[in-house]
Each structure stands twice: as structure tokens, then as C-alpha cells.
Amino acid sequence: GELVMAAGLTPYSVEAMSCFMAGTKCEQTFLRKTEEEGFPETMCSYHRVFLGAALTGILPKPNCMIYTNLACDGNMMTFPYLKDKFECPGFYIDVPYEKNRESVLYVADQLRKLKRFLEETTDRRISEETVRSAVDNSRKAAANYKKQLALRCAHDPVTSLTNELYALFMCHLMAGSETAVTYTEKLLRDVRMSPRGDGLSVIWMHIMPFLQEPVKDIFNYSKKMHIRACDFIADGFQEMHAEDPYEAMAEKMVYCIYNGSVKQRVEEAERLARITEADGAVLFAHWGCKGTIGASSLIKQSLEKTGLPTMILDGDGCNPANTSDGQVSTRLQAFVEMLEKGKEEKQA
């Protein structure tokens, strides 16, 4: 995000664009188009909607594509395909599995090449001062996020799933922007001004199905159920320690919780639950996300061993046809009742 901001480009992502299109209720048209092209139904719905929109000509041809092997295996199918289809320049960032100094230096070198790629693509010079300024903005945003996180155990702003998703824009697409700094400053202010809620609180893991009615009914503007932190967002706002701006950006990618062993996702959820004093955790197992679905049972078992009640919520954040509202509602209500009972027993 920081280099894209330094280049003065306006980025959009597969997930963000597909969320928007699903919100307009036109996703089925694009899913059918993707199916006609031979893409498997087991592929992530965000990527299938995005591919379908691109194939129907709804999406404009981008100036370039930047992608990585982090978080989503769909990247490795979607972007090479569209790069050839659009005859569009693309840049791939390879992030090693190992988390060490060598990996950071390896990725930092790729990011320096990415800067040159963006200069050639835009025909515009990117100064080192602009790059450093973008990284400094990310440091400020991360510091603000850390401060508000520390307050969450005693402050519960009434919010919605959509509001939580705004933070994903700030720590990923808009990382390094002045807007991201302003967002975290206002978030910190809002949290400070909010009282402690009387209801339950959870840590949310992975993406949020903000369009699904039973999930909205439980969480949106609720005084009974609060999301105190999301691992996806907390990871995006992680602190960067390296002085060199390219190494700092590389550090954030190499040490991403979605890179490497699932153990890091468990440890991050434990850390967030401890800081925020959450009553439980919800892991959203999104359709087609093989990494999360495959690790979900291990994550649940590991967290419950520490005393954190955890629910695996199967569903689809982009294609409502893949999820039963009734089943989701029943499971969520049962989980809420279990948390309420557990809280009463602790207070007794």
C-alpha cells in the first residue's frame, strides 16, 4: 500500500470490488460468467465475482496489477490470468515462508524493484522522501491503532460490520496515506469517548460477512455484542521496526500472520483476546478459503485450550447462495447463549 500511495495511484482490490458488487445484488451474473470460463466453484467467491466482472467488461483495464502469495491462494490464479487477458503489466511479490532477516531483505529488494516498476508504468518519478513519508504514516497509524486496542477492554463503541471493514481499507489499500492516519486518530478518539458495554465481546478472525442478515442482526449497532478486535485488521496495523523504509514494508509482509504456520494466527488471537478481555472468538471460514478452512479446527482447539470459547462460522462473504441464513442464525444465537451462560458463571 505504501508504495502505491507514494506513486499517487488509486488502488482497488479483489475483495473490496467484489464486496461492492455483491452489495448491489448483481454478483450472480458475474459468478455465472466465471463458471462459463471454467473456473471451479470451489474457488474463493471474491475472486470468482471479480473475474466475472472483468470478463464481462464491467471493470476498466487497470494501469497495472500488483499481487503476492500472501493470505489468499486465489491470487495465483486470478492475477496471472487477468494480466494476460488485459495485456496489462503486472508485478508479483514473492514472500518466503520463513520469517527471518534474510526473508525481509529478499522482499525489501523486490519492493525496490516495485518502485522502479511503478515509475515506468506511470511515467512518474517517486522520490525516496515520498516513500519514507508513506512509511512514516503507516507507523503513526499503527501507533494509534495500538493505543485504541489497549482501551478496548473498558470501552465499547457501538459500531457495525461495515464500519469494521473500513479499517481494512486503511491498513491495506490505503496504507501509508494521510487518510489512514486521520482514520486511526478518529478511531482512537471515538474509543476513548465510548463507555464500557454491558454485553458480550468477541475477537473476530478473518474477513467479515457484512451482507449476511443474521450476522448483521447480532452485531450491527448492538449494545449486547461487541467486536473488540479483528486479527486481519490488527495484523495490517502491525508495528514496523526497521529504519529503512523498504525493509519496514518487507517486515510487515514477512511477519504477516497469514504467512507461515497457523500457530501465528492462534498466538495473535490469544494476544488480542488478552488485551481486550474478550469473552469469546468467532472464526469466519469463508467459502473457498482453503487456508482458513483447513486450519479452522486447529485454531478452535488451540484457543479453547486457553479458555477462550471459539465458534467456527462457515459461510460466504460474497455469495449469499452458498449460505443458509437460518442455519447461521441458529448457530450464532446458540453461541451467544453459551457466552452469556459462561459470563454469568464467572460472575457468580
Show where each model-derived region lies.
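Peripheral docking tails and interdomain loops at the edges
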Residues: 297-348
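A charged, amphipathic alpha-helical module
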Residues: 108, 112, 116-239, 258
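C-terminal hydrophobic structural anchor segments
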Residues: 260, 266-306, 311
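Glycine-rich, highly charged phosphate/nucleotide-binding loops
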Residues: 37-55, 257-271
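Gly/Ser/Thr-rich loops at beta-strand to alpha-helix junctions
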Residues: 1-2, 69-75, 205-212, 287-294
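Acidic/His-rich segments in extracytoplasmic proteins that coordinate ligands and/or metal ions
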Residues: 48-120
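Redox- and metal-dependent alpha/beta enzyme cores, enriched for Fe-S-associated oxidoreductases
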Residues: 3-29, 203-274
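Metallocofactor- and cofactor-centric catalytic cores in central/energy metabolism, strongly enriched
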Residues: 2, 11, 22-25, 29-36, ...
